[in-house]
From Swiss-Prot:
Cellular component annotations (GO), alphabetically ordered: cytosol
Subcellular location: Cytoplasm
GO molecular function: fructose 1,6-bisphosphate 1-phosphatase activity; magnesium ion binding
Keyword Nuclease: no
Protein name according to UniProt: Fructose-1,6-bisphosphatase class 1
E.C. code: 3.1.3.11
Binding positions for Mg(2+) 1 per the UniProt entry: 91, 113, 115
Coiled-coil residue windows: none
Length: 334
């Protein structure tokens, strides 16, 4: 494959589809640069004294890792001065982050999970960053949380970075899904996969099976049928994969198919799932759909959900289209 940089790809996309104006290109280049900085911090590990907890909790009530806070600060500081954003929101912050008055205000809203899978940090398992870009309302002067509450179908860009054996950046601007790999010697993002496609059928599924006793009947039925293998109703064997890092699980599914499930369960009836809609489920759903897959909450398309609050949680079923449609049909039939 000819070496195509991220910048070249964005410029050519604008020429072909007129969907990446200069401000949006700047935003994506800044986010990509911030991901390089995070990758460098992750790569240092104990040598950089960035492992362990920070003795604090985020808005979700989760104990923060040092790298959670570092990654959040990197993304905020990289993006607030460029003039391309109206405001930002993060998993690590209870309220939105306003652009300081000394900087010009742009026309986009950026949401992110700065370090997904951070429970894996100390054991050297792949983690990543997830981000979503929305358009701000015309003439916006003082952004509020309500301005972020747009359905996922309104996203103009979604992407994630995986910090693993290689550092990769996967994104969609609404015209397919592209993967860029960080050339560590040159410091540049180089396209390594174009128009990624998820196979419609699969023999792999990803779910935290330790919660099986709490699953609702549709999820239990679906997983039990897969576990029955060739002697069961599916008449084929399945393998289970679970990394406990959404970016790593989804990246595997993008490359070789599969279904990722994080359902609601009976432990906390008032909590509809664990994953956050705005900066986890929505961007991943946009990417998966653009790669030919499907993404639902068990009842409806994730991208059609109208958010009610910034840190809203949802059940998630995404990946190979036929499998997502099957488990969704079990939910609708209950």
């Amino acid at each position: 494959m000819k070496r195509i940089s991220l910048t070249q790809y964005l410029i050519e996309e604008q020429r072909l589809h007129n969907n990446i104006p200069a401000e949006l290109r700047l935003l994506l280049e800044v986010v990509a640069r911030a991901c390089k900085t995070i990758s460098h911090a992750v790569g240092k590990g104990a040598l950089g004294e960035v492992l362990g907890t920070a003795q604090s909790e985020n808005v979700q009530g989760e104990v923060q890792k040092k790298l959670d806070i570092i990654s959040n600060d990197i993304l905020l500081e990289a993006n607030e001065w460029g003039g391309h954003l109206a405001a930002m929101a993060s998993e690590e912050m209870e309220t939105i982050h306003q652009i300081p008055n000394r900087y010009p205000m742009g026309e986009y809203l950026l949401l992110f999970d700065p370090l997904d899978g951070s429970s894996n940090i100390d054991v050297n398992v792949s983690i990543g960053t997830i981000f979503s870009v929305l358009k701000a309302a015309d003439g916006m002067q003082a952004p509020t949380e309500a301005d972020f509450l747009q359905p996922g179908s309104k996203q103009v860009v979604a992407g994630y970075a995986v910090y693993g054996p290689q550092t990769v950046l996967v994104l969609t601007t609404g015209n397919g899904v592209q993967c860029f790999t960080l050339d560590r010697e040159m410091g540049s993002w180089v396209m390594t996969q174009r128009d990624m496609q998820i196979p419609a059928n699969t023999k792999e599924f990803a779910i935290n099976a330790s919660n099986a006793r709490h699953w609702h009947p549709p999820v239990k039925r679906y997983v039990d049928e897969m576990l029955a293998g060739t002697t069961g109703p599916r008449a084929k064997d399945f393998n289970m994969r679970w990394i406990a890092s959404m970016v790593a699980d989804v990246h595997r599914i993008l490359n070789r198919g599969g279904i990722f499930m994080y359902p609601a369960d009976a432990r906390e009836p008032d909590k509809p799932g664990k994953l956050r809609l705005m900066y986890e489920a929505n961007p991943m759903a946009f990417i998966v759909e653009q790669a030919g897959g499907a993404a639902t909450d068990g009842q409806q398309r994730i991208l059609d959900i109208q958010p009610e609050k910034l840190h809203q949680r949802v059940p998630v079923f995404l990946g190979s289209k036929n499998e997502v449609e099957l488990v969704t049909s079990y939910h609708k039939a209950k």
